[in-house]
Amino acid sequence: LNALKILYVSPTRALVNDLFRRLVDPVTYVGVELGRKTGDRSRLDLKHLPAVLLTTPESFDSMLARKPRVLQTLSAVVLDEIHLLDNTPRGDQLRILLGRLRRFHDKLQYCALSATIDDMDIGARYFDDAKVCFLKSTREIEYELIEQDDFVQKVFRAAKQRGLKKILIFFNARSLAELFSQKFNRPPFHGAVFVHHASLQKQRREEVENRMNQGEIGILCATSTLELGIDIGDVDCVVLYRPPFDISSLLQRIGRGNRRTNKLFALGVYTNTWERMLFETYFDCAIKGQLFEKRYQPSLSVIPQQIYSYLYQRQRIGTTLQSVYNILLPVYTETQVRTAFKRLIDDGKVKENRPGIYFDGYELEEKIRWGKIHSNIADVAFGEYDVISTESNRLIGRIFHLKHRFILSGRCWETVRIVEKEKRILAKCIGDSPAVAKVFEGKGEGNYSYMLASVLKQRICPDMDVMEFPITFERGNTYILHLLGHLYGFIIADALSEQSQDASDAEGKILILNHHVLAGSTFPIPEKEAIKKVIRRNIARLEDALGSGAYFYDLPIDMQIEDHYLNLDIEGFVEFLSLIRLVHIDLKGFQKVINSLKK
């Protein structure tokens, strides 16, 4: 036929390659040709097109901008693992790409696949008349939690007791995956221990995947890159070294194990009582199907990227601002598009060759040549900083937000130097924090949804109502246990400080109002304008933490602030805080609540 009939869009090149390996034989057997197009395999033979093409959002963007005629023969579009793209810049990019495709081909069938779903409207964002079909899993989740001390030996013991042949271990940092791969490389797994993370060369990653797939035994130490559905064979057990970032991430990770049975078995490794409670909460919510995903908000950084891509598609004749509105308005407002467009003209990234007719500017030539205008992928480091003591040169813990003075591990610290490239802070101890603020000796977990705070609080204070949170007073100071995590904890404290309230956050768990005794039972909610000022001061660090897209800085500053404001779901966050009722307990009782997490 030499005509493309099905476009199968998958989130990553690795997933495309894995799907190709698994599908090429059965699909070819029934007389259908299967192809793939990714950044690694960018060439497409126009004289010999496959009937089914596996690709990524970025390569789909490239085809639409550079070879749109290839897509005119399509009958169907399949969106794989849509939950990994939705509510991200790449998800909004895909939404607009599908709209651009429909402008010249509106007779298409759509299908979206998702391993987890928390938002019933997810399909409607990508195509009309979306119907949700649930295939309820009968897979039972079994898990054990173990302390970090000597956990390598504990994993070996579990392997012996349960007859585990293949084990997948997830770490939240590449350095830990490398370190522990050496510690696991001993009998009975000597020579069969591998590492998998994004920094490895593609050939090495594929070699590791093949060896795990084909070998009879093996341990694979990996990072979040293996949360995706890459086929590494039948894994008997998934080990999670410290809690993942959220419940969806936990489900993705444990879902990699026991794929050919009806039971999932996982081991969670915790370093302190707080992490144990996080694990228990995550697993409990996962079993109940409660994911606590953040509410959908459009990513504004996609506006400039899609303008560049569309202008390239129209490079011969140019396009009008109205045409740009037409492709973007289903997702963004006219004001947002017009404001961003003006900034691109002012910066020379869009040029007006004839009155009202626009083209990509010379500033973009290199990005066009290398295909960079088709990607919204930006490097993300989750915005956390290692805190190193200047006295001992040891790692004290991790914090999200940088302040000159802060509380960590129950002590007060003063920043001496920030090493931004290495995400490190050198700090000196300036004394113990108040007794009531000596909270958790953790490493700074706190990327979960603010809505999870009430669930965590119920585990600590089961006798309180769901939206009741404890408050106490000591020496003219106010202490509120909020458990909102580092991200929202620092936003509250800094925004209140912006309003001349001396406020600080203790490890994303306690709000401290210094020299102020709070009256009433209402949570102290900062004004939204104060929150926006905090966002403005922390544009770069929040961009790093939130993953705001590759073209975030092509937006004007006010839109950068708005993008963070939307990404953080500040409207929903403020609404959540307004539902909290503070319940006073005496200092001794408050300390008892805190100590319950240290047992």
Where are the regions that the model predicts?
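ASCE RecA-like P-loop NTPase motor cores
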Residues: 82-83, 95, 106, 248, ...
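Conserved nucleotide-binding/hydrolysis modules and their immediate coupling elements
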Residues: 354-456
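Conserved segment of the helicase C-terminal RecA-like domain
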Residues: 108, 215-217, 246-296
